[in-house]
């Protein structure tokens, strides 16, 4: 009896290592490094060799990616603004989000998708703006073409989204491709879903040419939609994310519940249920909801009942300066007065034990 138990204890550390992802630094931290490309490439912890090579070889692309981090994190925070976990970032943490993304949850799925989408968007935009030496406008969009409105000429600058997707796949997926575990496959799937989401909203824009504004000739180009459209789309995918398990040969997924539909390449997938994010929990990486503003009249996720997890709330009476009495003056200005507005602000109470908790 002792021998089998001894064998179990011997293998337990290896089993836990396989099941639990390591707290790794990430290219997400590029936002915080700043400085020259060489400084950035050499000082972002956790980049694998192929990522560092791309970083040194394409400093202009890296600048676009690092500037784009702020954009997709802001979009993540916008989408989660009314939820207990609000996509808060930790400036001093190399993983940007701390331990909360160690869990293979819906939130992890969304962050990987929106970050991958953000890289595509940032690179493609930089190409169109002439900020990247290795790419420019889409070279395939030349000559004449036809759509439902008739013949048109490709002109202007079509966003070269294929280059953005190709570079994003090579850079973002590099670390995950070195892994063989379930979490690596989950991240790769959600990375791809994010890239596809940006391309989904590529739209054709046209300009008419002719006498008195007639559309005798049309010049058209392809342009990415505002990143908010991608964020809204991925938010819907987050709410419909599909829980999966690894298949028997370890090469893909199968649904965790046979009542679920099989995930497509556009869906987000996750393995583990999310924590409730109610209290500060060091192991889960949760900051809790103590002090968060809640909506007393809402019945949604931002309601005081849901946001505060039943702990109650404090009410503060505050005043703020607002614009009032606005009038339109010909021509062409709107003039307003500054008014003081009194309002009540409701914030979630802290739990009785407000310190970090460690689950037993």
From Swiss-Prot:
Gene3D superfamilies: 3.30.2460.20. Its main location: secreted. Residues 1-25 form the signal peptide. The keyword Secreted applies. One of its GO terms (biological process) is positive regulation of neurogenesis. InterPro entries: Wnt, Wnt2, Wnt_C, Wnt_CS. The keyword Lipoprotein applies. It is found in: Secreted, Extracellular space, Extracellular matrix; Secreted. A lipid is attached at residue 212 (O-palmitoleoyl serine). Glycans are attached at residue 295. Palmitoleoylation is required for efficient binding to frizzled receptors. Depalmitoleoylation leads to Wnt signaling pathway inhibition. SMART domains: WNT1 (SM00097). Keywords: Developmental protein, Disulfide bond, Extracellular matrix, Glycoprotein, Lipoprotein, Secreted, Signal, Wnt signaling pathway. Belongs to the Wnt family. Ligand for members of the frizzled family of seven transmembrane receptors. Functions in the canonical Wnt signaling pathway that results in activation of transcription factors of the TCF/LEF family. Functions as a upstream regulator of FGF10 expression. Plays an important role in embryonic lung development. May contribute to embryonic brain development by regulating the proliferation of dopaminergic precursors and neurons. This is Protein Wnt-2. It comes from Gorilla gorilla gorilla (Western lowland gorilla).
